[in-house]
C-alpha cells in the first residue's frame, strides 16, 4: 500500500504524520529536526513512502537535501497554499498541521517549490549577508544624520567618501557630540570594510560565471541584478515559458473575476521580493540613465507616455525577467534592435 508523510518543521523538534492511501493515519511522532534523525525514523518504520513533503521555510532546503540524498521522494510545499488549505482548522497545532499536510500530499493538492542546488543556496546566503550589511550601514548613517539634525547640524548631500570627514567638521569643539559620533563612525568604518569584502566576493563570482556575464549584456543589468536573478531562478528549465518568470516573481497584476465582476489589480508581489527590487532598479536605469536606445526601451517609453513612468518601470521589470530567462535558456546575448534579432 502507498504511504505519504508530512513534516511540520520546527527549530528543535518536527511533527511527522504518516497516512496510507486511504487517508488513515498510520503513525505520528516528534522527531529531531535533523536530516539523520528523520531518515532514521522513516527507515525504521519499515514502510514504502510514495512521497514525503514539508512546507518551504528556512530549514526546509537543508532537510530536503538530506532526505533526497537518502533516496526518498521529497517535495517542498508552497507556503501560501499550505496556509490557505489549513486556514479552516479551528485548532492550530504542529500535530494538526502535519496531519493536514499529509492529506494534501496524498491528494496531490499542493504546488511544489523548486529545491535549489547547494551552490545556489550559498550564493543566495552571500547576497543576503551583503544586503544586511548594506542596510545596517544605511541605518547607521541615517541615525547619525538625525542626531546631528536635532542640534541644527546638517550634513547635506555628501558622498560616502566625505561622510566621516563632514561629521567630524560639524561636531568639532562640541564634547558631547564628539563622544557619541566617534563610536558610531568607528562602527560605520567597520561595516563599510566588511560590506566591501562581501561585495568583492559577489563580483568575483560574477566574473567567473558565463551566465551572469551574458545577462549583463542587457542594458541596465549590472552584476548584482544578474547574480540575484540567476540565484533565484537556479534552473531555467523549470519554466516552460519565459513569460511565466514575471508572474513567478510577482510582477503581473492580480485578477478578481466572479460573475459579472472582472477586474485587474496591482501586481501580486508573490515570490522573491529581492528579485522584484533589482529588476525594478534595472528598469529605472534603462529608462533614465542608459543613453543608447533599444527596441525594449522604446517600448517602455511608449508605455510611460500612456500609463505613467511608474507603471512603465514595473512593466519593463516584467519584460526584463522574460528577456533574462530567454537569454539564459537560449545561450544568446541581448540584441539592441529588432533588425539585429531578425538577422541572427
Outline where the language-model segments fall.
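Phosphate-backbone recognition surface of nucleic-acid-processing proteins
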Residues: 214-217, 223-224, 228-309, 343-344
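Short alpha-helix plus adjacent loop in nuclease-associated cores
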Residues: 75-121, 125, 132, 163-171, ...
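Glycine-rich, often acidic, oxyanion-interacting loops/wings at catalytic, nucleic-acid
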Residues: 127-214, 338
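Short, basic/hydrophobic alpha-helical segments
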Residues: 35-51
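Low-complexity, acidic/Ser/Thr- and charged residue-rich accessory regions of DNA metabolism proteins
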Residues: 260, 297-344
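Gly/Thr-rich phosphate-binding beta-strand-loop-beta motif of the actin/hexokinase/Hsp70
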Residues: 1-20, 101
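Short glycine-rich, Thr/Ser-proximal phosphate-binding strand/loop in the N-terminal lobe
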Residues: 12-36
Amino acid at each position: 500500500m502507498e504511504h505519504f508523510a508530512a513534516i511540520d518543521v520546527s527549530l528543535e523538534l518536527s511533527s511527522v504524520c504518516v497516512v496510507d492511501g486511504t487517508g488513515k493515519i498510520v503513525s505520528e511522532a516528534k522527531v529531531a529536526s535533523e536530516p539523520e534523525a528523520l531518515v532514521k525514523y522513516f527507515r525504521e518504520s519499515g514502510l514504502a513512502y510514495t512521497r514525503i513533503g514539508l512546507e518551504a521555510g528556512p530549514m526546509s532546503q537543508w532537510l530536503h537535501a538530506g532526505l533526497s540524498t537518502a533516496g526518498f521522494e521529497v517535495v517542498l510545499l508552497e507556503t501560501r497554499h499550505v496556509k490557505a488549505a489549513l486556514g479552516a482548522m479551528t485548532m492550530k497545532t504542529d500535530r494538526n498541521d502535519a496531519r493536514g499536510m499529509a492529506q494534501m500530499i496524498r491528494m496531490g493538492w499542493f504546488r511544489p517549490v523548486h529545491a535549489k542546488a547547494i551552490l545556489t543556496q550559498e550564493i543566495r546566503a552571500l547576497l543576503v549577508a551583503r544586503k544586511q550589511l548594506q542596510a545596517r550601514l544605511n541605518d547607521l548613517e541615517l541615525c547619525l544624520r538625525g542626531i546631528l539634525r536635532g542640534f541644527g547640524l546638517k550634513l547635506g548631500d555628501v558622498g560616502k567618501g566625505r561622510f566621516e570627514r563632514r561629521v567630524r567638521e560639524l561636531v568639532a569643539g562640541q564634547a558631547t557630540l564628539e563622544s557619541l559620533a566617534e563610536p558610531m563612525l568607528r562602527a560605520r568604518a567597520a561595516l563599510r570594510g566588511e560590506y566591501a569584502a562581501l561585495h568583492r566576493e559577489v563580483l568575483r563570482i560574477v566574473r567567473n560565471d558565463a551566465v551572469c556575464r551574458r545577462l549583463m549584456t542587457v542594458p541596465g543589468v549590472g552584476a548584482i541584478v544578474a547574480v540575484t536573478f540567476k540565484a533565484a531562478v537556479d534552473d531555467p528549465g523549470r519554466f516552460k515559458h519565459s513569460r511565466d518568470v514575471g508572474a513567478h516573481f510577482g510582477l503581473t497584476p492580480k485578477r478578481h473575476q466572479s460573475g459579472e465582476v472582472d477586474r485587474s489589480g496591482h501586481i501580486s508581489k508573490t515570490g522573491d521580493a529581492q528579485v522584484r527590487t533589482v529588476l525594478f532598479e534595472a528598469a529605472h536605469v534603462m529608462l533614465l540613465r542608459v543613453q543608447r536606445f533599444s527596441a525594449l526601451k522604446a517600448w517602455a517609453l511608449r508605455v510611460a507616455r500612456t500609463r505613467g513612468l511608474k507603471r512603465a518601470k514595473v512593466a519593463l521589470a516584467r519584460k526584463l525577467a522574460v528577456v533574462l530567462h530567454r537569454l539564459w535558456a537560449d545561450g544568446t546575448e541581448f540584441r539592441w534592435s529588432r533588425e539585429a534579432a531578425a538577422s541572427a
